[in-house]
Swiss-Prot record:
Chief localisation class: cytoplasm
Transmembrane segments: none
Protein name listed in UniProt: tRNA N6-adenosine threonylcarbamoyltransferase
Family of this protein: Belongs to the KAE1 / TsaD family.
Record's function text: Required for the formation of a threonylcarbamoyl group on adenosine at position 37 (t(6)A37) in tRNAs that read codons beginning with adenine. Is involved in the transfer of the threonylcarbamoyl moiety of threonylcarbamoyl-AMP (TC-AMP) to the N6 group of A37, together with TsaE and TsaB. TsaD likely plays a direct catalytic role in this reaction.
One Pfam short name: TsaD
Any Gene Ontology CC annotation: cytoplasm
The enzyme's E.C. designation: 2.3.1.234
GO annotation terms (biological process): tRNA threonylcarbamoyladenosine modification
Residues engaged in binding substrate: A133, V134, S135, G136, G137, D166, G179, D183, N273
Record flagged with keyword Ion transport: no
UniProt xrefs under Gene3D superfamilies: 3.30.420.40
Organism whose genome encodes this protein: Geotalea uraniireducens (strain Rf4)
């Protein structure tokens, strides 16, 4: 099956052409970072307008790069949620119009599900597995039993890990988005220079909390204003990143121990972080865990990942009707009830 996949949940306008949910023929991403940088974060209304301006061009580029035409497309997969309502609607409206015009089926898929399943674009792995989905808007641990079958093990009680990175970067005067900059600065710093707290690390649940860690960084900066410059900045970034990674790795290890499943997927934008990738690899080696982390391009928002669950649902006649609407909030473990066979 040849799928056109569309992603517009936040500030990337993306389209991809993927065969059989595994073979990427093209994967085009138009970023809005430069547009939102001056505001220090994503402005939803501006994001929606930029999606409207860009989406047709991005789709055309994806088709050209794949060497196919619209009439070759067998179905369309589109991000239905979670995400920004206006941004989602741009992608969904475009997908519905194209599917109707072409007479092909459409599948609305979950953005977080797509992050978790993106690994299948690079290799096949067996179910079940434990998944850590970690991004700017989500930090969750899931038990993944099969495509469409997910159980939430734990989640953030406040800030997501990626959100904490961006907020701390802002405290340090770093430009948006700051997570990648903290990662680069941390590489030259001492992760043991400052002992920041590890929230909920000894808690028996699999939940996360990062707002207190962010506040600890703020308090440290107020007492040590020089820490935002030079070598001290590298040490602060390394120490903050180490605290976040320690919590993520510890909770993942606990989930592996509790479920008895020694197969782990780490997915989402924060999975690009070099410190997290390194510490997860150490955990895997120490505990004999089969670890899977997609390449950075497939960790960040893209449309190729949307095609993975999209292909599964369309191939199994689990379709979305033309009344498909945006789901800004869409818990992953409720996904089965959102999909109707043969509709």
């Amino acid at each position: 099956m040849l799928l056109l996949a569309i992603e517009s949940s936040c500030d990337e306008t993306a389209a991809a052409v993927v065969r059989d949910g595994r073979i990427i023929l093209s994967n085009i991403v138009a970023s809005q970072i430069s547009v939102h940088a001056g505001y220090g974060g994503v402005v939803p209304e501006i994001a929606s307008r930029k999606h409207l301006e860009t989406i047709s061009t991005v789709i055309e580029e994806a088709l050209q790069a794949a060497g196919v035409s619209l009439t070759d497309v067998d179905g369309i997969a589109v991000t239905q949620g979670p995400g920004l309502a206006g941004a989602l609607l741009v992608g969904i409206s475009t997908a519905k119009a194209m599917a109707y015009a072409l007479g092909v089926p459409i599948a609305g898929v979950n953005h977080i599900e797509s992050h978790i399943l993106a690994i299948f674009l690079e290799r096949s792995i067996e179910f079940p597995f434990v998944a850590l989905a970690v991004s700017g808007g989500h930090t969750h641990l899931y038990l993944v039993e099969a495509v469409g079958r997910y159980k939430t093990l734990g989640q953030t009680l406040d800030d997501a890990a990626g959100e904490a990175f961006d907020k701390v970067a802002k405290l340090l005067g770093l430009p948006y988005p700051g997570g990648a900059l903290i990662d680069r600065l941390a590489a030259e710093g001492d992760p043991e220079a400052i002992r920041f707290p590890r929230p909920l690390m000894r808690d028996e649940s699999f939940n996360f909390s990062f707002s207190g860690l962010k506040t600890s960084v703020l308090n440290y900066l107020q007492k040590n204003p020089a820490a935002a410059d030079g070598r001290a900045l590298n040490d602060l970034c390394a120490s903050f990143q180490a605290a976040v990674c320690d919590v993520l790795v510890s909770k993942t290890a606990a989930a592996v121990s509790a479920t008895g499943i020694k197969r782990v997927v780490v997915a989402g934008g924060v999975a690009c972080n070099n410190g997290l990738r390194r510490e997860m690899s150490r955990l895997a080696e120490l505990k004999g865990i089969e670890l899977h982390i997609p390449s950075p391009l497939l960790c960040s928002d893209n449309a190729a990942m949307i095609a993975v669950p999209g292909d599964y649902y369309l191939s199994n006649n689990i379709l979305s009707g033309f009344d498909i609407d945006a789901l800004p909030v869409w818990p992953l473990d409720s996904i089965a009830s959102r999909l109707t066979k043969g509709s």
